[in-house]
């Protein structure tokens, strides 16, 4: 079932622009991942990765980024969550890259500071075409439920590399691992929303002084 069947229609026509959607499938000997997304959505989400905590975080990206997102994944989680977690990041990154196309008219940069109780996380990103991750989350526990907290970094490495995004994630406070991670995903979502929005003063233009991204 396609995202158009499961998720809401776009709000993009406000500027009479094409709907920015993508559908990407990645199948390996370890995982089978499909991502459908609509950048101009309303935050509807279907996430079934076999990793409940990752599903919860994907819902944060969708809800706070106002992206309609459908992620379906089957992987070798009987061995470890690593392959599925990473491949979801890879596929989501590829879908973002596909949906953005030539990146004409986008704001390009995004920045947000998100609190969650005692946790405070700052994210800044740039759809620069130069993939990079600077990661500064320090969780006090190795696991949140059954989820290995090391996998948060692996997810964002995969996403940044495959979306060609420069991404900085910095923790300013926090003592609860769940709160720290969720604040990070919420800050990422709001930064993503900001960066991918269309700037009405630059419609049809590459947001770079070089004229290329």
UniProtKB/Swiss-Prot annotation:
The entry's keywords: Amino-acid biosynthesis, Cytoplasm, Histidine biosynthesis, Lyase
EC code(s) of this entry: 4.2.1.19
GO molecular function, one term: imidazoleglycerol-phosphate dehydratase activity
Superkingdom per UniProt: Bacteria
Disulfide linkage: none
Catalyzed reactions per annotation: D-erythro-1-(imidazol-4-yl)glycerol 3-phosphate = 3-(imidazol-4-yl)-2-oxopropyl phosphate + H2O
Listed pathway(s): Amino-acid biosynthesis; L-histidine biosynthesis; L-histidine from 5-phospho-alpha-D-ribose 1-diphosphate: step 6/9
Transmembrane segments: none
Keyword presence, Lyase: yes
BP GO annotations: L-histidine biosynthetic process
Pfam families: IGPD (PF00475)
GO CC entries: cytoplasm
Subcellular location: Cytoplasm
Family: Belongs to the imidazoleglycerol-phosphate dehydratase family.
The protein's name in its UniProt record: Imidazoleglycerol-phosphate dehydratase
Native organism: Trichodesmium erythraeum (strain IMS101)
Taxonomic path: Bacteria, Bacillati, Cyanobacteriota, Cyanophyceae, Oscillatoriophycideae
Gene that encodes the chain: hisB
